[in-house]
UniProtKB/Swiss-Prot annotation:
Glycosylation site list: N251, N257
Extracellular side: 98-112, 169-188, 238-275, 334-350, 415-416, 474-487
Organism: Pongo abelii
Protein family according to the UniProt entry: Belongs to the amino acid/polyamine transporter 2 family.
Catalytic reactions on record: L-glutamine(in) + Na(+)(in) = L-glutamine(out) + Na(+)(out); L-alanine(in) + Na(+)(in) = L-alanine(out) + Na(+)(out); L-asparagine(in) + Na(+)(in) = L-asparagine(out) + Na(+)(out); L-histidine(in) + Na(+)(in) = L-histidine(out) + Na(+)(out)
Single annotated GO MF: alanine:sodium symporter activity
One GO biological process term: glutamine transport
Ranges in the topological domain labelled Cytoplasmic: 1-74, 134-147, 212-216, 297-312, 372-393, 438-452
Source lineage: Eukaryota, Metazoa, Chordata, Craniata, Vertebrata
Alphabetical UniProt keywords: Amino-acid transport, Cell membrane, Disulfide bond, Glycoprotein, Ion transport, Membrane, Phosphoprotein, Sodium, Sodium transport, Symport, Transmembrane, Transmembrane helix, Transport
Gene of this entry: SLC38A1
Residue numbers of Phosphoserine PTMs: S6, S25, S28, S49, S52, S56
Subcellular compartments: Cell membrane
Membrane topology classification: Multi-pass membrane protein
UniProt name for this protein: Sodium-coupled neutral amino acid symporter 1
Notes on activation and inhibition: Inhibited by alpha-(methylamino)isobutyric acid (MeAIB). Inhibited by lithium, potassium, choline ions, N-methylglucamine. The pH dependence has an allosteric effect on the transport.
Amino acid sequence: MMHFKSGLELTELQNMTVPEDDNISNDSNDFTEVENGQINSKFISDRESRRSLTNSHLEKKKCDEYIPGTTSLGMSVFNLSNAIMGSGILGLAFALANTGILLFLVLLTSVTLLSIYSINLLLICSKETGCMVYEKLGEQVFGTTGKFVIFGATSLQNTGAMLSYLFIVKNELPSAIKFLMGKEETFSAWYVDGRVLVVIVTFGIILPLCLLKNLGYLGYTSGFSLSCMVFFLIVVIYKKFQIPCIVPELNSTISANSTNADTCTPKYVTLNSKTVYALPTIAFAFVCHPSVLPIYSELKDRSQKKMQMVSNISFFAMFVMYFLTAIFGYLTFYDNVQSDLLHKYQGKDDILILTVRLAVIVAVILTVPVLFFTVRSSLFELAKKTKFNLCRHTVVTCILLVVINLLVISIPSMKDIFGVVGVTSANMLIFILPSSLYLKITDQDGDKGTQRIWAALFLGLGVLFSLVSIPLVIYDWACSSSSDEGH
């Protein structure tokens, strides 16, 4: 994906200047619903999030505290697309293989539309409270508990993304090194062991970058990451017409024709023990919510309607890209596809695959520090240790990287990362938090009865998603072995 949702989250959430009186839109459309200069909301009382809408106050804010956005609609679409795109794209073909084409299309379409709706709820909450940062919005509505919950959800999502990126390094770097050495894929040595390589990369490259006081150019790696994934999509489509369907070895009781027909025929609806990972993987692929409000705050002539248009365009573009990657990846390998689609492409003399593999590896290595910076900053914020201290900065960085490496080494498959993060933090950020915030903010508004019913149903859907998916994922772990994918 690659998601690289990271660049925006970090540069915007951590380095963006947010005015004390959170943003007053310079688009007059934001104030058409207001009469007599007031909003009937108990959340307006706090000065840090208040928007007094009298003309004189608006003029004052423009002069001293209000900072208008400067980013065009097109660039905002690009930024939000960067925020959506991540490593989840590598797992979508596996999700399709375990649901079938029709069921996958229904799930992908549903999550896309529901994600757009959740962003609409988030924008309404931002407009009502004036908050332009997700964590501050949670604190404004639910107090310290809300702040902690949102910090926890975003940190878990970013940690899951880091795990998936380092898992890509663990999976793909050995193949790239073997190719450059002219060795077969079966070649074995300590210097092509993914577990060793991920530790070397982490402490040789990622650690020094994570120790930097600020990100600098790393905040702009998301554009490179998105380019890498567009390149990956092109290669996936191209390889579909180059790689023949792989037929497993036959035993004496099965004929070649029947096996080939069964293996190389697309399935439209499939249900098995791995189907449970489909929805969490798709949800993981669409999480971008912590970046929405910072992008909104930077949008030129911003309004809720304009930001919703940015959201609609970005999600539609990612929907097309995700579906193409999933369908062409599936039609190349059918039931043999793995949860890391890129790892399935092997070829001793295939320069094109080597190129895309190296591009993705470089992209994820440069993206991990961006996500790491956000997680570490969140921890320091929660601990109220925001003043820079080199010793604490170094110790916390090393401890977090050691823990992350231990998890990456022990995790058998990328689907496990998608499954856990998808049913927990992704579900919280897409379904539960936006609907909960909206219901709390509008609990005194009798004019929004219908909208509140839809938001309540949306919240119930998120809770149901958790209650069903979490036990099924745990059950699959208990019943399955990592040998299912040959890792």
